[in-house]
Amino acid sequence: MIENLIIREYNSSDEKKWLQCRLISFHDSAYYDDVYTKKPVFNNSSLELVAELNGKIIGILDLEKDSEDGSICYCKSGVGAMIWTIAVLPDCRRYGIASKLVLKAKEWSKVNDVNFIEAWTRDDKWVLDWYESLDFEKFHSYWHIYFKGDNAKSLFDSNDKDISPQSVFAHSNKNPKTLDQNKIDRFYKCSGYKLDITK
């Protein structure tokens, strides 16, 4: 299937296909509602790749080198680069396309004096297993929690009666299983992974 696969740099004319690839690729994952309407623009050195097959974008990767003040990567052991997006269309998985994108990211990182690649993901086991198969190591985790309706309102302290929050997305170090489940709409464990490329 991938004999004609081309991995190349993203260009602005790819944006619509890039957005479609990301949307469809995330649809069967825990990030199904993390929808972009515009492709992000990066302020620091970055690698933006697309995997193209017969004119169709079937995979994408965005990697950004950490800023001088270290405000992008959570890890502080050297210079890092963050994978903001990596995705492959469901029908095109199991052909090693995502792994090829990561290999390109490693090559770019070595040339650009990056010591490690960092990535964050939710608790899809198949995604976690994939990162670990590439020698990424988990270094931290926390929780994404969603509240809706009256439960969202109870978290929002405002004297403005014209504001009525209907949904709240929160980061938490507290396991949501210890909270009142009737107040939570849904939650995910978000884990940080790190690939040391100095070895």
Model-derived segments and spans:
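A short beta-loop-alpha structural element at the N-terminal edge
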Residues: 3-18
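Active-site rim helix/loop that mediates acceptor-substrate recognition in acyltransferases
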Residues: 23-72
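Conserved GNAT acetyl-CoA-binding A-motif
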Residues: 109-121
